[in-house]
Structure formats: structure tokens, C-alpha cells
């Protein structure tokens, strides 16, 4: 079966599973998931499965991407904050719906790979950066929409504070060893209305930035009568 046929099969499965927003389905149809899948898993690009990527992270299951995107309601929105760029697939789907996507990722390696994919796909409305997702992106706040693609143990006040009036935050909450729930929070008149959208399973949202690997020490070698040299 060709990739195109597999994509059609996946879209039909998403419709059967409750994804009814035509804008979301169109965005998923327009984004080539194979561009975000590691080579060993290319034959599974359009299976409804989560797939491993670098740094112990995952490329989310298409059903989960569609479900979160539908819950977010990003079509026609001016800007969206995404916490957790990962492979960039969710980012790319969002870029087909809103005018600009600001995306924060703690791993420099992942953001570099994602940026190369964005350039290859000519996604010029994506603004990625390396940063601590727990802090959001206060310089660009407030945001009418925020989506978090890793699970904090509870809702982060720093992200809620960056929601615009009437804004929506979609976030999986809970510890990995316990039950996680997908939540949708809507800010109305300085209060937050919370809805539970069902169980999910995500990698944890980790605070802070990873330490850079130390540079290897220079090797000192004896070079004979002329003395010592650094390799």
C-alpha cells in the first residue's frame, strides 16, 4: 500500500473515532507525517501509533494530535503557543490552521531537527526556540491558544497567566506512573473553566534545560624530542 493510500485510511479512521472538524482533518491531510518519522519506522508513518524519536521523546499518535488540535480550536487564530516541539509534527499541523505558531523545546537537538523540517516544508509561520516550557513564552503573551505536548504533574500557573481573555489551554496532566487526563481550560472574566477530555499518556514535562554534554578533554601526547602536543 502506498503512503498516499495509508494516509487516506488514517483519515477515515480519525473520522470514525470522532474527529469531525474539517479544518483539522484538512491540516492533517496536508502535513506529510513521513517527514517527521525516523527512518526505521517509515513504514508506520500513517499507522495510528505513537513512535519513538530522539532524546527519549515520542511522535504522538495521530488520533491524539487530532483530538488535541480539535479541542484547541486553532483555526483562524492569530497565534498559538506550543510547549514541546518534539519532532515538529504537531507544530506543522497547527501551522496550517493559525497565522503563527510559537514553539518552545528544551532539547537543542530536537529543535534543530524540527527547524530543518520546517524549512524543507516551507513553514514560514513557525517561530521555534530552545527554552524551559514551564515558563511558556512571556515576551509574546498573551496567547489566545496554548497547547502542551508533555504532561506536567499539575496545571502550571505560568501558562494560565499567559492565556488571553477567552483563551484556551489544552494540556495533559498527571504523573507518568499514574493516570493522566487531558484538560481544556478556558479563561473567562479572570476565572478558569476546566473540562476533562479523557485519559491520555504522555512523556513528562520536565522543568529546566538539560545540561550540555561537556567537551572532551584534549589528549596530551608525547611527540618525541620536540616536546608535547595537544590532540
Feature map (PLM): residue ranges:
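Conserved nucleotide-cofactor-binding alpha/beta core module
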Residues: 73-193
Amino acid at each position: 500500500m502506498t503512503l498516499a493510500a495509508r494516509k487516506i485510511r488514517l483519515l477515515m479512521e480519525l473520522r470514525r473515532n470522532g474527529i469531525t472538524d474539517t479544518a483539522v482533518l484538512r491540516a492533517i491531510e496536508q502535513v506529510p507525517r513521513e517527514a517527521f518519522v525516523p527512518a526505521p519506522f517509515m513504514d508506520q508513518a500513517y499507522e495510528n501509533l505513537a513512535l519513538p524519536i530522539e532524546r527519549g521523546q515520542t511522535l504522538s499518535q495521530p488520533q491524539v494530535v487530532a483530538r488535541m488540535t480539535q479541542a484547541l480550536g486553532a483555526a483562524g487564530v492569530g497565534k498559538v503557543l506550543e510547549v514541546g516541539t518534539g519532532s515538529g509534527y504537531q507544530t506543522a499541523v497547527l501551522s496550517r490552521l493559525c497565522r503563527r505558531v510559537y514553539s518552545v523545546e528544551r532539547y537543542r537537538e530536537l529543535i534543530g531537527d524540527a527547524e530543518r523540517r520546517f524549512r524543507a516544508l516551507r513553514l514560514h509561520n513557525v517561530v521555534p526556540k530552545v527554552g524551559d516550557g514551564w515558563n511558556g513564552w512571556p515576551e509574546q503573551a498573551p496567547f489566545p491558544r496554548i497547547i502542551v505536548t508533555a504532561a506536567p504533574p499539575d496545571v502550571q500557573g505560568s501558562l494560565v497567566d499567559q492565556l488571553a481573555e477567552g483563551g484556551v489551554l489544552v494540556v495533559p496532566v498527571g504523573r507518568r506512573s499514574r493516570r493522566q487526563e487531558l484538560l481544556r481550560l478556558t479563561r473567562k472574566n479572570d476565572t478558569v473553566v476546566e473540562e476533562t477530555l479523557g485519559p491520555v499518556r504522555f512523556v513528562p514535562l520536565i522543568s529546566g534545560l538539560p545540561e550540555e554534554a561537556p567537551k572532551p578533554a584534549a589528549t596530551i601526547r608525547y611527540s618525541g624530542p620536540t616536546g608535547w602536543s595537544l590532540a
